[in-house]
């Protein structure tokens, strides 16, 4: 009997151990499915000359209006396009919008793309490629280190109107035009060029494309389909078709201003841009020591279904997608402080969205913690497939600065909303964003004209992660400028024509807004020994441009220390063949060396300046190196020198 009891006891112990192990595995699986996704890098181009997340933040923080007149460099017949009568066919009653600078500029040589192929590439493909490279560098990661990795590419993009018919195909681009004008290839082009082997997916759900792309990227990361992912969206108006089409729908604001949730709202502002994020699991970011800008706690996507119309917003569907995102994030509505709204400024869509927010986030809130509501479309317009990315980047920067920026053009809240139905307030002026007892959190909404809705919830970086980069050392600094300049103009203009004087617009990298001081932050103060800054590029002129950009960056931000810059240049950027090294004891010496390199002049702080000055390029010549050690036998080099006149003559 005793033996049977012992056997039963052993059996029960084994079963209990197996049960506990199974429970642990289930918890691990469930935890992985809800693990926050870290945003470790960001890049963007938006109206107002914005070329980085920091510049986008400066634009919204200073309450700038980036809307401008229709561009004159896209071969558009502006006189024929504009007509004040909305009933006039084939015209636009709006003549302003949000446009990025130089959409035709592209450094094809940097990416190993031939001039002919570049001519056949739509601007969306070029911008997505540049922005993806920049996002990786912004994370302090060498893009070449991701080659062959399980990195996914999820890019929102719709129909490419680079060339609407065969007569507009740029001369010399035959054989490349079909692929270069395919939206499906936008993500594939990035993956191919950078050697990324995760899923490459182009998302087209209209205005919600970039947020849907981020949702899919988060799912792929949590399910283990990829380890890291690029996610975002891109939109460029190469033709006047969007203005004509939305004028026919009466969807544009006559004065070109999106007045989100305002009593005088009268339509949206068409805009363009690109925004890309680099994402990875929060646990992986911790382990790798990557700087985390913010985390994505949860997200959701749904569809309007059968509603009042194909393009009409559906309030109940918007409420459902918000609640689904909160469930995915394991949060309640009162846990979220603010929402970056879809808010385009239309008289139909804005009231429906506001009522959905009032019914969800506006309920059961503390009296002193209303939901704050804003829209970046009041600054830059509706960037279409990149709109969600713009909203996410804005809110990430707002979290890091502790400020909720104001929305523009709100004289009074729209009377078509019952604002007493919940505790939601418009951001008519900038407000401090206190952290309180919990991290800052924000929702971001995007609703597509296709009926596809997306909502994403951002959270401030956990404190234990914020200071954990590189074992508690300074965060890496990505320095502006990728050091590339094409030797020959290769890019066609946004409308398919070749510009007379194309300007190269190389990927320009960015810098974190809060660098951590290490040593030598004071102007002219010694940094504890010589500090080397390794500058590299693909060509001689590009090397000068890189030096100039770096000098400007360091001069503009004295808080960035020489040690941080040196570390970042050496460890987090690709080292190209054309290189120079600036060595200095302090910031003044280092900047002086950079300025000399940019000017093509010698300087005591500049090492190996020959390839960066006006001396002939000697790259590719064979060099014999005699180390003095004798690779086969002692004194081998000396013996060759003394015995063979040919070696003696060549060596001397």
What is the meaning of each model-derived region?
Residues 2-477:
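Condensing-enzyme catalytic core of the thiolase-fold
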Residues 14, 127, 131, 545, ...:
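A non-catalytic, amphipathic alpha-helix used as a structural packing/dimerization or gating element
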Residues 58, 356, 542-545, 592, ...:
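Short, solvent-exposed alpha-helical surface patches in well-structured domains
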Residues 61, 101, 222, 247, ...:
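Alpha-helix boundary recognition
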Residues 186-187, 608-652:
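Helix-rich "cap/lid" substructures immediately adjacent to catalytic or cofactor-binding pockets
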Residues 298-299, 303-309, 592-596, 602, ...:
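Acyltransferase
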